[in-house]
């Protein structure tokens, strides 16, 4: 079986001063994200791939509810009945998110000091040459920073992404808010599953 080759290009990190966090995210997004900073149920989700760090899912990031209510979506993104094959969060998991060409999936969630990277699973379409862009914008009242990763594949198979850094610009409470934007830049449908954050700097 051919193994999917993922590439990550040009992780750019930039910093710029911004206004208050409420102006960046809006009151609803801020309140929802703050709730997610209170509970951490972790698992060694990527141990099969040599990564023994602990991870926890972002709100709605397993897609098992069948809803994308935790996300802002465009371009017909939806929940589909296919899971990443390792079922790292439970054998009963059966769903993922499908992103048709041009579709986007966006979520805002809270992280704390030391929660400095994330990973997810992606499945490329059968036609070669497509790509998935994963952008993170980290924001606090002190400032913001962005990372951008491009994932490409030459075969159709599920695979974990490399670690995606979350830049530390945490506020006085030790928290910061991440907006994740996943964009399908290809001509076929990508699947995305199990969006997970590494809660401690264990590397």
Put a short name on every predicted segment.
Residues 187-203:
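Exposed low-complexity, polar/acidic, P/S/T/G-rich flexible segments that act as propeptides
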Residues 63, 116-124, 175-184:
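Extracellular beta-strand-rich recognition modules
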Residues 20-30:
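C-terminal segment of classical bacterial N-terminal signal peptides
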Residues 34-36, 47-50, 56-95:
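Extracellular glycan-recognition surfaces and repeat-rich motifs
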Residues 49, 53, 139-177, 183-191:
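Extracellular carbohydrate recognition and processing domains
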Residues 2-15:
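Bacterial N-terminal signal peptides that target proteins for export
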Residues 71-73, 98-100, 111-115, 123-132, ...:
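Extended, low-complexity, turn-rich repeat/linker tracts enriched in Gly/Pro/Ser/Thr and Asp/Glu
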Residues 89-117, 161-163:
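Short beta-strands within extracellular/lumenal beta-sheet-rich domains
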């Amino acid at each position: 079986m051919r193994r999917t080759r993922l590439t990550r290009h040009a992780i750019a990190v930039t910093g710029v001063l911004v206004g208050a966090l409420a102006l960046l995210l809006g009151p609803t997004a801020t309140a929802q994200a703050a709730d997610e900073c209170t509970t951490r149920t972790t698992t060694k989700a990527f141990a099969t791939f040599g990564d023994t760090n602990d991870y926890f899912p972002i709100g709605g990031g397993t897609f098992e509810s069948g809803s994308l209510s935790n996300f802002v979506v465009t371009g017909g993104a939806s929940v589909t009945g296919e899971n990443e094959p390792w079922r790292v969060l439970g054998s009963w998991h059966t769903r993922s998110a499908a992103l048709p060409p041009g579709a986007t999936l966006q979520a805002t969630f809270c992280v704390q000091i030391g929660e400095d990277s994330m990973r997810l699973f992606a499945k490329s379409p059968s036609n070669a040459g497509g790509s998935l862009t994963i952008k993170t914008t980290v924001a606090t009242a002190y400032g913001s920073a962005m990372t951008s990763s491009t994932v490409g594949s030459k075969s159709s198979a599920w695979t974990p992404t490399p670690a995606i850094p979350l830049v530390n610009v945490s506020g006085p409470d030790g928290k910061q808010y991440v907006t994740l934007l996943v964009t399908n830049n290809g001509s076929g449908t990508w699947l995305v599953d199990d969006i997970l954050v590494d809660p401690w700097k264990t590397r």
